[in-house]
Amino acid sequence: MNNLSFSELCCLFCCPPCPGKIASKLAFLPPDPTYTLICDESGSRWTLHLSERADWQYSSREKDAIECFMTRTSRGNRIACMFVRCSPNAKYTLLFSHGNAVDLGQMSSFYIGLGSRINCNIFSYDYSGYGSSSGKPSEKNLYADIDAAWIALRTRYGIRPEHVIIYGQSIGTVPSVDLAARYESAAVILHSPLTSGMRVAFPDTKKTYCFDAFPNIDKISKITSPVLIIHGTEDEVIDFSHGLALFERCQRPVEPLWVEGAGHNDVELYGQYLERLKQFVTQELVNL
């Protein structure tokens, strides 16, 4: 999430715009697409073609474990979806909402590595305006996008909510919190979450204004599933205090992971990241 200039901050304060404009300023940095989806003659099967920028780290055999398709949202956009079969005996599937400056092509290698290490399959999607998804990124589209992904995961693959872990990273915590506040699932994982858009731009903000965007802080108490929060203590984009504030509002918090010294984009490089996820998925969820 990019910083606003002084003039832009003054404009926000003096002439508060609608939440959608705040969202666009703060959040969306879609990269040039790192992949394409090619449909076969039947119109039912899509093939994933990665560019060099996707930095694919695995063999063609692992790539065959990835299934891609397009689905339509309630707002009329077609979004790209990806199902990664990482483990044949996986009990859980992560519904993964990624960060603001990547697409599915860039995340595909990470998904295979993560899923195979914590014994979970991974379902992900690109936001409207990202990758092969149509439309433009916006707060309203974020919510419609994850709704479409949730429906596709349940109907196309028959995965029940009690076997879905809703996982959001950075801006991806926004649709994740919104969905989890409306539907119960096995668990929720929030990785470098934000409390709200205004609180990122104005750290001293104490309440949610009508023109605020991404109000996770006002929704998180509605989540009835167990919530694991992960945040780096030296996060330079979304301050560590956001993770703490959300943790304090959770109905069913589990032991959080505060990664000492980690920033916004390197939490997963620390050994305790995988250790905490493994413990949560393979041990704690069984007893919750």
Swiss-Prot record:
Record keywords: Cell membrane, Cell projection, Endosome, Hydrolase, Lipoprotein, Membrane, Palmitate, Postsynaptic cell membrane, Synapse
Name of the protein in its database record: Alpha/beta hydrolase domain-containing protein 17B
Gene: abhd17b
Record's bilayer topology term: Lipid-anchor
InterPro entries: AB_hydrolase_fold, Hydrolase_4
Taxonomic path: Eukaryota, Metazoa, Chordata, Craniata, Vertebrata
Reactions this protein catalyses: S-hexadecanoyl-L-cysteinyl-[protein] + H2O = L-cysteinyl-[protein] + hexadecanoate + H(+)
Function: Hydrolyzes fatty acids from S-acylated cysteine residues in proteins.
Gene Ontology cellular-component annotations: dendritic spine; postsynaptic density membrane; recycling endosome membrane
Protein species of origin: Xenopus tropicalis (Western clawed frog)
GO MF term set: palmitoyl-(protein) hydrolase activity
Post-translational modification: Palmitoylated on cysteine residues located in a cysteine cluster at the N-terminus which promotes membrane localization.
Keyword Lipoprotein: yes
Membrane spanning residue stretches: none
Active site: S170, D235, H264
Main location: membrane
